[in-house]
Amino acid sequence: MHRFASLQGLKADAEEWEDLEHRMKDAFNARFLHVKEGTSPVPGHTLYPDSIFYGNNTVTANILPLAFGLVPKNYINEVAKNAVTSIITTNKGHISTGVIGVQWLLRELSRRGHANVAYLLATNKTYPSWGYMVEKLSLI
């Protein structure tokens, strides 16, 4: 909204909307962002990121704040790595999001440097996956 107000030359409105945006981000992060730095067995390793995650640490809980620009800049890579870790280790390369998360999943993985994981999800043919549905259920 602050961008629209700025485009219209409404400086006071733009400042008010920008302030509200920052307060909303701060409140969201205060409630849902969990930061437990220094807990990884192998710091910096892709499969063992520090415990920096959102909500209940599901793929969707981590992907949506990335997609909506809510993650503080210094935590973006770690939140993305945490989503990748869940996909690879917990979900064994399978999609675990519902309709809300899946629409942002491949886009955010690719945007954050994990296009290989997005490709894995898109091409996986074991259950549960899109490839499995295409191969097994296309005759129905």
Region annotations inferred by a language model:
Residues 1-140:
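Active-site core of glycosidic bond-cleaving carbohydrate-active enzymes
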